[in-house]
């Protein structure tokens, strides 16, 4: 059985026991999280939401809070001695899926 959930403005296909990286959640390591926006449940009994499946949820455990690799942006204007260098590290949350309630 698998499900498609929406969190952080993105859609993720999840299965029980799988680990996913999502946009940062306000939870500590070891906390339980519940995703209520389930738009599809697949398996023996397929359910499609309009826009979400009624009564469906996905439960998981927060494994890690972290930051991705640095992305560097560099802008310059030729012949003007002007340049700008900026870095950004996007925060993420690693979640292990425990149960899919359909």
UniProtKB/Swiss-Prot annotation:
Residues 93-102 have a biased composition (Polar residues). The keyword DNA repair does not apply. It comes from Limosilactobacillus reuteri (strain DSM 20016) (Lactobacillus reuteri). GO terms for biological process: translation. GO terms for molecular function: rRNA binding; structural constituent of ribosome. This is Large ribosomal subunit protein bL21. One of its GO terms (cellular component) is ribonucleoprotein complex. Pfam families: Ribosomal_L21p (PF00829). Residues 77-88 have a biased composition (Basic residues). This protein binds to 23S rRNA in the presence of protein L20. Keywords: Ribonucleoprotein, Ribosomal protein, RNA-binding, rRNA-binding. Part of the 50S ribosomal subunit. Contacts protein L20. The gene is rplU. Residues 77-102 are annotated as: Disordered. Belongs to the bacterial ribosomal protein bL21 family.
């Amino acid at each position: 059985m698998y499900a498609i959930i929406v969190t952080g403005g993105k859609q993720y296909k999840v299965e029980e026991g799988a680990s996913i990286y999502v946009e940062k959640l306000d939870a500590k390591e070891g906390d339980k999280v519940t995703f209520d926006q389930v738009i599809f449940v697949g398996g023996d009994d397929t359910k499609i939401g309009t826009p979400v499946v009624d009564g469906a949820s996905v439960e998981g455990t927060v494994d890690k809070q972290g930051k991705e690799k640095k992305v560097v942006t560099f802008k310059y204007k030729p012949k003007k001695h002007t340049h700008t260098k900026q870095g950004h590290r996007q925060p993420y949350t690693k979640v292990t899926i425990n149960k899919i309630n359909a």
